[in-house]
Amino acid sequence: MLDNSRARSIVHLLILLKAHVITQIIKNTQEFTSLCTFVKVTLKATDGLTSAASKSQTDWALGENPTSRIKKLITELETSSDRIRLGEEPNLTIQLPQGDPKQRLRRKLEVFLARAKYTEELVRQAQGDVGGRCNEAKAELEEAVTGRKGPDLETQATAAAAALHNKARGTACKVAGATTDTNFAGTSLVADLMCLCAAETNSREKHICGFESHASGVWANAGTNSNAGEIWGKILDACKNREIQVEVTPQFLRIAITKFEGLLGAQAHKLTSNGNAGAWLLGYSMNAGSVTCDGQSSTNGICVDYKGSSDARGPIAWLGHIKNAITALENRDKNLQRVRKLQRQAEAILMSAEDALIEANISLGGKDMVPASEVTVPNSSNPTSRQNSVVQEPTTVSAAAITPLILPWTLLI
């Protein structure tokens, strides 16, 4: 049996070991997850904000657009003798008026056709706006990741990481007085993730973000042997494998921004030692009074320093791109709502055209409908185009009058 002294020593050792493990786990894991969230949103947007995806969101609910369906009604009206098939229902036909009443009915349908065409043109314009805003949001998200404009996200991201090759880490991971050649903090998510997660040596802080990042190389403070592009590949793989459920929506991105901003200064110790020096640190530091974020020790900081030339937060370019993406997504959503509203208006015009045919049938005494198979209805794919005439609006049919003729597709409106 162990004596009390040895037992206490073992317990104490286990406590210290557990504390060490916890410290290793918590250091920059939350910060990595926060920035990784924006990267994963961007990767999802690469597939979800394409032209095909935006088109699928604005297709006609009933398949064929109302203009085409009204054209078919006009074609059948002109080519049928006394009965016409209504809509796409094979067993529904109605009797047609003859002579002048038939011509007046045709002119009514042409007025509805003109209205449908105008409304559908507005639909097409709004659909184009949806696609444009999708492309804009996608481009902003990709530039947030890479700090560069370009069609290939992963190639641009690797190039952004390679730009850190041989750069002094203590300078590159600061934003104060940012210049293209030396200061990279805040310019891209790639740069900030490198500052948070790249090991400084093969043995120092190699699990700082919760995964081993040094297998493909290290990023020393002097910038030598950094292999930045390979380290980024390791970080990107870890991000892709991180179980984070993301959405490409304004609401989700706003929440992600709030979480990111809540981490600023969260791990900067001794904030009172030098005013507000550690308030804008992202990542781990034991000494906010003289932070270098050079990765050489926990005291110096394995972090990103967003402090500007004064104690205020400096510019974070990638965050600006995320906010621009939010605006683009909000405009996309507004245009989606406009598309759907206009589509409902166009479909209502189609219903009015069909109601005009029903009204004509009722005016003839509401003859019983007969199966279409008993009526020869020519099928023309080239409807005659005519100039629209100015006519009076069709009279609205009372609900009581059309109740016996409830059409299956009207239940979809």
UniProtKB/Swiss-Prot annotation:
InterPro entries: Trypano_VSG_B_N_dom. Residues 1-22 form the signal peptide. A lipid is attached at N379 (GPI-anchor amidated asparagine). Disulfide bonds: none annotated. It is a lipid-anchor; GPI-anchor. It is found in: Cell membrane. GO terms for cellular component: plasma membrane; side of membrane. Residues 380-413 form a propeptide. Its main location: membrane. Glycans are attached at N91, N361, N379. Keywords: Cell membrane, Glycoprotein, GPI-anchor, Lipoprotein, Membrane, Signal, Trypanosomiasis. It comes from the Eukaryota. VSG forms a coat on the surface of the parasite. The trypanosome evades the immune response of the host by expressing a series of antigenically distinct VSGs from an estimated 1000 VSG genes. This is Variant surface glycoprotein YnAT 1.3. It comes from Trypanosoma congolense. The lineage of its organism: Eukaryota, Discoba, Euglenozoa, Kinetoplastea, Metakinetoplastina.
